[in-house]
């Protein structure tokens, strides 16, 4: 009789577990359908690579690109749906998160064509490269929708591990190994700091891990103004600062940019910032709702340091990738203005609009650098002298992207900064906006210095690299140029039609 009762209880428990798993798979699983498409693409790549003796490179690229495009399509089809919380509160789906997921997918879709010829020339393992890119994209997407402390920690670690492996992908390159080691050590330290901050939040809120429940827990425990919350805020700012790479958390950025393969740098330069920005807005806005003045002050300091140091140090650089590294530090200072403004005065809409333009400007610049590097084997700024005489199309494309990064009208970068600064001014961030304007002028100086080198036609200034410049005969070259053309167009034309883009961002968010 006892055995019969125990058997019935076991059957009932098993049925409940099965029904709960079925519910998660059927209902919650549909909320991460774009992510499931990427997972299916990853599995398909692994199966083909492990079962096929011949490596059909175009087929691998097709599977990766198709997975990303299908994921974007699935994301667009569920646009403007009601916000949903799934997986027992671990994941949230809403318009704000989906915009950042769209930006990450867009970055990865544009980055894969940049890597085609580079991988063929350097004879890198193609399957592993694409697997790391897709897995990092998946981690970034989960980070955008993370709704509890555990997911907020695990998702960026998924992205970070793939980033470490990608940065050290050229194992025979000493600079790449050095960059990977610095990246790994500083990334591990920042993750430890972030976990320590989460422990303070967890304890102060009475054992809560969901973001909104942490706020309720802090109210119940009356700990929202306690020293523990201040410590958590400080450590979270340091931990997230590593992902965003503002000054003074920028030490790893120039070395990783210079030592890593150029397509990898292009990927990391945009996806990491998009994912970290999405995470920062949610963490600062929700758990630290009662400490808004404190985190506003911290971010203002980071923004000022980033805009000043990033743009001033960029002037002295001789490597294109190091120059873009310091330029990206300055650019993240502008993005932080939008984070500080927040929901009021269209702060988030201006930040998202500028990030969309920054993706096209930055990836367009890196596409030009990849092409030039493959055809000349150099990354030195002086070696670009006279490029216009050999390849006017590449020189003009690079010039347009650099001018857009500098914020010259009527390019997209100008209108993106104008919208961002206007929102900051309306929110009363006068000092930040003035510093942003001054440092933008500084950035225009070093961008114009490069453009002057590109357009020079005097033989004594043309280096042997440009004098012996030859177009690549590889058919895959078209993929890089296609990505470059898309980015150049996106860096110029959207500036003319700015209002519809702003209207879409505002209508989606609010």
From Swiss-Prot:
Membrane topology: Multi-pass membrane protein
GO MF entries: NADH dehydrogenase (ubiquinone) activity; quinone binding
InterPro entries: NADH-Q_OxRdtase_suN/2, ND/Mrp_TM, Ndh2_N
Keywords for the protein's UniProt record, in alphabetical order: Chloroplast, Membrane, NAD, NADP, Plastid, Plastoquinone, Quinone, Thylakoid, Translocase, Transmembrane, Transmembrane helix, Transport
One Pfam family recorded for the sequence: Proton_antipo_M
GO cellular component terms listed in the entry, alphabetical order: chloroplast thylakoid membrane
Reaction it catalyzes: a plastoquinone + NADH + (n+1) H(+)(in) = a plastoquinol + NAD(+) + n H(+)(out); a plastoquinone + NADPH + (n+1) H(+)(in) = a plastoquinol + NADP(+) + n H(+)(out)
E.C. code: 7.1.1.-
Presence of the UniProt keyword Transport in the record: yes
Residue ranges crossing the lipid bilayer per the database entry: 24-44, 57-77, 99-119, 124-144, 149-169, 183-203, 227-247, 295-315, 323-343, 354-374, 395-415, 428-448, 484-504
Compartment(s): Plastid, Chloroplast thylakoid membrane
GO biological process: ATP synthesis coupled electron transport; photosynthesis, light reaction
Function per UniProt: NDH shuttles electrons from NAD(P)H:plastoquinone, via FMN and iron-sulfur (Fe-S) centers, to quinones in the photosynthetic chain and possibly in a chloroplast respiratory chain. The immediate electron acceptor for the enzyme in this species is believed to be plastoquinone. Couples the redox reaction to proton translocation, and thus conserves the redox energy in a proton gradient.
Family as reported in the entry's similarity comment: Belongs to the complex I subunit 2 family.
PANTHER family named in the record: NADH DEHYDROGENASE
Assembly, per entry: NDH is composed of at least 16 different subunits, 5 of which are encoded in the nucleus.
Record protein name field: NAD(P)H-quinone oxidoreductase subunit 2 A, chloroplastic
């Amino acid at each position: 009789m006892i055995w019969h009762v125990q058997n019935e209880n076991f059957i009932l428990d098993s049925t409940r577990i099965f029904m709960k798993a079925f519910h998660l798979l059927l209902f919650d699983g549909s909320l991460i359908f774009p992510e499931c498409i990427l997972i299916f693409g990853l599995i398909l790549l692994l199966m083909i690579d492990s079962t096929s003796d011949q490596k059909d490179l175009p087929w691998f690229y097709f599977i990766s690109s198709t997975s990303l495009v299908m994921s974007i399509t699935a994301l667009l089809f569920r646009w403007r749906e009601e916000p949903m919380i799934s997986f027992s509160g671990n994941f949230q789906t809403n318009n704000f998160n989906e915009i950042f997921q769209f930006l990450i997918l867009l970055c990865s879709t544009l980055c894969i064509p940049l890597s085609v010829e580079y991988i063929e020339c350097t004879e890198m393992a193609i399957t592993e490269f694409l697997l790391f890119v897709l897995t990092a994209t998946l981690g970034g997407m989960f980070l955008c929708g993370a709704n509890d402390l555990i997911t907020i920690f695990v998702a960026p670690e998924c992205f970070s591990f793939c980033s470490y492996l990608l940065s050290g992908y050229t194992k025979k390159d000493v600079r790449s190994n050095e960059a990977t080691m610095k990246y790994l050590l500083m990334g591990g330290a920042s993750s430890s700091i972030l976990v320590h901050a989460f422990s303070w939040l967890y304890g102060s809120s009475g054992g809560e891990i969901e973001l909104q429940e942490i706020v309720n827990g802090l109210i119940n425990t009356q700990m929202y103004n306690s020293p523990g919350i201040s410590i958590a805020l400080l450590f979270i700012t340091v931990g997230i600062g590593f992902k965003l790479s503002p000054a003074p958390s920028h030490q790893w950025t120039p070395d990783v940019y210079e030592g890593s393969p150029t397509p990898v740098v292009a990927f990391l330069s945009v996806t990491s910032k998009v994912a970290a920005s999405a995470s920062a807005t949610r963490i600062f806005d929700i758990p630290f709702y009662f400490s808004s003045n404190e985190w506003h002050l911290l971010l203002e300091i980071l923004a000022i340091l980033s805009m000043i140091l990033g743009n001033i140090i960029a002037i002295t650089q001789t490597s294109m990738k190091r120059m873009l590294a310091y330029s990206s530090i300055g650019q993240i200072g502008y993005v932080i203005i939008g984070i500080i403004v927040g929901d009021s005065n269209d702060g988030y809409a201006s930040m998202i609009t500028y990030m969309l333009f920054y993706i096209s400007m930055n990836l367009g610049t890196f596409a030009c650098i990849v092409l030039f590097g493959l055809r000349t084997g150099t990354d030195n700024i002086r070696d670009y002298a006279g490029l216009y005489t050999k390849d006017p199309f590449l020189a003009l494309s690079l010039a347009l992207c650099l001018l857009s990064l500098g914020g010259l009208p009527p390019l997209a970068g100008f209108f993106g900064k104008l919208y961002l600064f206007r929102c900051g001014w309306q929110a009363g961030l006068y000092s930040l906006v003035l510093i942003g304007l001054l440092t933008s002028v500084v950035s225009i100086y070093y961008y114009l210095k490069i453009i002057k080198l590109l357009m020079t036609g005097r033989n004594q200034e043309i280096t042997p690299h440009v004098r012996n410049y030859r177009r690549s005969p590889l058919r895959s070259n078209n993929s890089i140029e296609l990505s470059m053309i898309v980015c150049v167009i996106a860096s110029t034309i959207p500036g003319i039609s700015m209002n519809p883009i702003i209207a879409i961002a505002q209508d989606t968010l609010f």
